Regions:
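Compact soluble domain cores
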Residues: 24-37
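Enriched for short, Lys/Arg-rich terminal
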Residues: 2-4, 8-25, 42, 49, ...
Length: 81
């Protein structure tokens, strides 16, 4: 699948590369798992509600989440917060 970051998602990802390589490694593992398993797998995937209906989150750490959706053959990542 193709991976597309929103501007905010990319900023989050770049900032984390400067701050915590361990979290970036976990995000990369989650993205690979999303590529293989869609909306199932690691990180306790959960559908989001309200203004983010259609998006899902996965746990990166106890407080941080990867926010994404899948359309056609593309993973859209809007946040790594």
């Amino acid at each position: 699948m193709n991976k597309v970051f929103s501007d905010y998602g990319w900023e989050d990802y770049i900032q984390l590369q400067k701050e915590d390589k361990k979290i970036v490694k976990k995000i990369n593992e989650l993205i690979k798992d999303i590529d293989r398993n869609g909306y199932e797998g690691m990180g306790k995937p959960e559908p989001l509600k309200h203004g983010l209906t259609g998006y899902w989150s996965r746990r990166v750490t106890e407080k941080d989440r990867l926010i994404y959706k899948i359309e056609d053959d593309t993973i859209y990542i809007i946040g790594c917060i």
